[in-house]
Amino acid sequence: MAIVPKFKVIEGWEKLPKGYVHKDVDGVATDSQDRVYLMTRQDARVIVYDRDGNFVRSWGEEIFTPRTHGIAIGPDDFVYTVDDGDHTVRKFTPEGKQL
């Protein structure tokens, strides 16, 4: 039997800076500090929030193709992304430095 997580929508949780938008979110992950990472196809970037929905940072604008496909956080808090536009899996620090 598969274990399926349950999610609850919290209206107004996400607080993006002015000018930031996103449409296609193809991955969501959390790290050990309860930061939430969205992998978006809009501007091909990762957007990071704190647990209360406050914007922390974004990164990846010059790295990804418009066909990003997923994101995961390892037990060491490294960020792993999948991009099927260039058939890559990449590893990053939580701050967005590619390793």
Model feature map: region roles:
Residues 1-99:
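Eukaryotic scaffold repeat domains enriched in small/polar residues
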